[in-house]
A protein has these predicted regions:
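Structured secondary-structure scaffolds
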Residues: 1-201
Length: 201
């Protein structure tokens, strides 16, 4: 919950070098003081599908945490008779090669067709909502390195994170600057960037 860390977000913001300084202290600082909890899901067609499958009654659910886990859950569904084949056929678990991941399509139109099986043997369909696209933007600094699955040294040893410098329009104080800062505070308890140039619209 953002409201539980908004004071920490404010404190961390004071360590960031903002140009102009007034944007960091004023516009962004005031936004952080009044930060509300962030609704992670959106009812849209584009974006990252929430990896949650539920039975029709809503009494059982599975939260899938990786492609490997989804692959294995699909295999269980095939064995239970809810699916006839694995759409990720040929995918090699543990192989992080780009060519291997090219076999996996996690777009909404694909994953919405995946039916999983609950612990009690009932069919489960995916939650229809998506993750807010701002979450994608805010997690970019480490997601681009496939962290935490690969390249841990780049993030854990501060080689590629936090960023030395970012720049965007002043409107991003409530967009990209905010989501970078919020996610970094929640996940790492540190800033996502050291220096910011905020220009006009």
């Amino acid at each position: 919950k953002v409201t539980e860390v908004k004071d920490r977000m404010f404190d961390l913001n004071e360590t960031i070098n903002w140009k102009p300084k007034a944007t960091g202290e004023g516009r962004f600082g005031n936004w952080l003081k009044n930060a509300n909890d962030w609704n992670l899901s959106r009812s849209r067609y584009w974006g990252i599908p929430l990896p949650i499958w539920r039975n029709e009654e809503g009494t059982e659910e599975i939260l899938v945490g990786s492609v490997e886990e989804l692959y294995n859950e699909i295999e269980k569904s095939i064995a239970a008779g809810f699916m006839t084949e694995n759409p990720f056929k040929g995918f090699e678990i543990g192989n992080m090669a780009e060519s291997n991941y090219d076999l996996v399509d996690l777009h909404k139109n694909v994953v919405d067709e995946i039916v999983l099986v609950s612990a009690s043997g009932k069919p489960m369909k995916r939650e229809s909502d998506l993750i807010d696209v701002w979450f994608d933007s805010g997690s970019m600094p480490y997601a681009q390195w496939h962290y935490p699955f690969e390249n841990k040294d780049k993030i854990d040893e501060n080689k590629a994170f936090p960023a030395d410098f970012i720049a965007e329009g002043v409107d991003q104080t409530r967009g990209w600057f905010y989501t970078l800062h919020a996610i970094s505070t929640l996940v790492f308890d540190k800033v996502a960037y050291k220096n910011v140039v905020s220009n006009g619209l």
